Amino acid sequence: MQQESQPPGHDWTRPAKVIPRPEHNVSRANISKPALKVLYRLKSSGYQAFLVGGGVRDLLLGREPKDFDIVTDASPDEVRQLFRNCRLIGRRFRLAHVRFGREIIEVATFRARADMHEEDDSDHVRDEGGRILRDNVYGDIDQDVWRRDFTANALYYNIADFSIWDYCDGAEDVAAGMLRLIGDPEARYREDPVRMLRAVRFAAKLGFRIEAETEKPLSALGDLLDDVPPARLFEETLKLFQSGHALASFEHLRHYDLYRHLFPSSDRELGREDADSFRRLLTNGLANTDSRVAERKPITPAFLFAVLLWGPISRAAKALLAEGSNPVMAISAACDEVIVRQQSKISVPRRFTTPMKDILCMQPRFERRQGGRAMRLLAHPRFRAAYDFLLLRAEAGEVDQELADWWTRLQELDPEEQRREVLGNERSGNRRPRKRRRRRSSGGDQKNA
């Protein structure tokens, strides 16, 4: 095996390697017009302006960047003065967002290196563990580069002459498919534990290998994620699982023992000997999510979290069923119990937990194929998502495939044929029809949020 080089140290005096335009493949034709407008206006106003980060990396790889980030020596207030369509955001990192319709160009100011901060500097604050809580001390590009995380993300495209500035051999790492942290990996992870999740995400997304020294602390430092605000972890979780590489991200998280810090109840369930069906459902569900992203079909966090949390919810519901609860109420109560525990790790907004609960509470209702019950279920606004979840359960061997096939066939019929099918099922069937007052459940018949 080829020996991998050590990560570069903080050589503050190291000059940038300037890669001229003829020697790289980054073309303005592949940069969005709004990003070019921001770059050119900053330049014409006398400021330095560089495209930086994942946008440059993806262009070098021949990929279409998801977004374009810009860095400059203009302060956030100076950027706001140049663009009427700009607003400043962030307390931890002050940033300018320049909006062009639905596209937002993020503009950051060069940051100073860590050792330049005074201990009582209110613009740079760390906690006792070294985690950066606020970082708004500005510097120049020679300092800014060492504040970035991975060498592949520390490439600067200069709009002045279309060259790329490379301080830490990032272009070589991109070409080699190597993910390498800048500086001492353990110190960088302690500065911002989310970098561990970013390492996993980029490795999954790009198919890069994680360099040995960058990889080494991952499994040992997972506890640092416990101190990250749950709202921030929600956003990072969406990036991990909704970018088209959910299954690979999940496998990396499990490999580095990071998954348990995000989804402890799900991780415990996966460790049980009788969790085969949940493992199949989870991996099939994540693979299905990746396929939908690839096909540009819509995906929702509600369905994603239903997949990730179904194992512990299902087990809790079975315990309640054994105590005499009805199936819908059992799943409703189990959802509440698991969601409350999960919120201490990842703060999932109610606009997603409510439809997630609907999807899961509808599962027992698929067993009832008689008359009006089936027709009402078919008309439920979340029927399609719940049906897709039923298909995953059938594929995992959790319910009979015949049940899923019946609901598939029912949807292919016209309304009159559907009524004949369910009425015939009612007359043939499993249960004597009788009139009774329908009891409302707390979970299965919720209105669309």
For the regions a language model picked out, list residue spans one by one.
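Catalytic cores of the polymerase beta-like nucleotidyltransferase superfamily
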Residues: 1-449
